[in-house]
Amino acid sequence: MSAERPLRTKLRTAQGRSTSSQRWLTRQLNDPFVRLARQQGWRARSVFKLQELDERFGLLRRGARVLDLGAAPGSWTQYAVKRGCRVVAVDLEPIEPVAGAVLLQGDFLDPAIQQELKERLGGPAEIMLSDMAAHATGRRLVDRLRAEGLGESVLEFAAEVLAPGGDCLLKLIKGGEAALLPRAN
């Protein structure tokens, strides 16, 4: 995977954009992994995180049942399907269809959505992926607590849906109690 650094691209117009939006857009325009993801047909650069972890730990095996939480825009779902997995994915935001995957739109924290995920899986999941992030408020403590609460909810659900020996891959922003979460069973 090669991501050569191109010449710096500047934002042509900043009209109507906040400073943070301008910074994000400039970063996107100049990120070699964004360009590489587009060239390879992936929906987001985050696919390379999953690919690296899969290559290192052998997480995604052909035929495995995979639950993808916080799936939009769908690059992790795309990758898991490409690896031959049976994927059920959910996000608050709509997800463009991915051939071979079951996609749901809804709040993962809603018990009705959790029940539907279990039904759609058709059995225990071999791996649960979560690239979810709580909506940011800009207040560090509140954001950290929300992220930790979301991570705990993912782990609680993993205990319900994972097959014995199953894996849970969870993105968590470091801070506070986050150091305790990886030790959870």
Locations of regions flagged by a protein language model:
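C-terminal substrate-binding/active-site "lid" region of AdoMet-derived donor-dependent transferases
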Residues: S2-R5, L67-L69, V98-A101, M128, ...
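Class I SAM-dependent methyltransferase Rossmann-like catalytic core
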Residues: S2-R62
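Glycine-rich helix-loop-beta junction characteristic of Rossmann-like nucleotide cofactor-binding loops
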Residues: E55-R61, L121-G122, E160-V161
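Conserved class I S-adenosyl-L-methionine
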Residues: R62-A72
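Glycine-centered, small-residue-biased loops immediately flanking beta-strands
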Residues: A64, C85, G166
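Conserved SAM-binding loop of SAM-dependent methyltransferases across substrates and taxa
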Residues: P73-G84
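Conserved SAM-binding motif I beta-strand of class I
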Residues: R86-D91
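S-adenosyl-L-methionine
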Residues: L92-T137
